[in-house]
C-alpha cells in the first residue's frame, strides 16, 4: 500500500513536470524566498563597517544575492553588527533589534563584535554582542575581509533554507 502511494506520487510528478508545472512544498518556497531576499540593516560601529561597505560596492556586489541595505530596522530582517560595542551603545542595539520585523537574524562581524576584540578588558566594552542580542552567524577577523563577510552571509542563507516555512524562533 505504501509503495503504491509513492508510485502514484512519482507518476503524478512526472506527468505534471512534463507539461510545464512546477511542484514544490510551500515551506521550501518560503524558506527559499527568505534566504534569497535578505534586507540587512547596518550597525557599523568601527572599522569593520568599512569592509561591509566594500562588500556592498560593485566589486563584490551583494545585490546579486538579493540583499538590499535598508536604513530602517522596520524594513530589515538582518542586522550586521560590525565593530566595538560599548556599554553605552548596548541599549540602542537592543532597541533597534526589537524594532526589526520577524523573522530576524543577526550577523556579528569582526573580533570586537564577536568577543570584545582588542578592547576585551576595557571597562566600557561589551564582550560580544551576543550578550545583548542573539547572534546567528559569527564572522571572525580584525577586520574581516569582504570575502569573509560574503561567506558568512552565504552561511546564513544556508541556515535560513534549513528552516521550515512559517516557523521561526521569536527569541
Curated annotation (Swiss-Prot):
Binds 1 [4Fe-4S] cluster. It is a peripheral membrane protein. Its EC number is 7.1.1.-. It is found in: Cell inner membrane. InterPro entries: NADH_UbQ_OxRdtase-like_20kDa (IPR006137), NADH_UQ_OxRdtase_20Kd_su (IPR006138). One of its GO terms (cellular component) is plasma membrane. One of its GO terms (molecular function) is NADH dehydrogenase (ubiquinone) activity. [4Fe-4S] cluster binds at residues 47-48, 112, 142. It is an enzyme of class 7 (translocase). Pfam families: Oxidored_q6. Keywords: 4Fe-4S, Cell inner membrane, Cell membrane, Iron, Iron-sulfur, Membrane, Metal-binding, NAD, Quinone, Translocase, Transport, Ubiquinone. It catalyses: a quinone + NADH + 5 H(+)(in) = a quinol + NAD(+) + 4 H(+)(out). One of its GO terms (biological process) is electron transport coupled proton transport. The keyword Iron-sulfur applies. SUPFAM superfamilies: HydA/Nqo6-like. Its cofactor is [4Fe-4S] cluster. NDH-1 is composed of 14 different subunits. Subunits NuoB, C, D, E, F, and G constitute the peripheral sector of the complex. Belongs to the complex I 20 kDa subunit family. PANTHER family: NADH DEHYDROGENASE, NADH DEHYDROGENASE [UBIQUINONE] IRON-SULFUR PROTEIN 7, MITOCHONDRIAL. NDH-1 shuttles electrons from NADH, via FMN and iron-sulfur (Fe-S) centers, to quinones in the respiratory chain. Couples the redox reaction to proton translocation (for every two electrons transferred, four hydrogen ions are translocated across the cytoplasmic membrane), and thus conserves the redox energy in a proton gradient. This is NADH-quinone oxidoreductase subunit B. It comes from Rickettsia typhi (strain ATCC VR-144 / Wilmington).
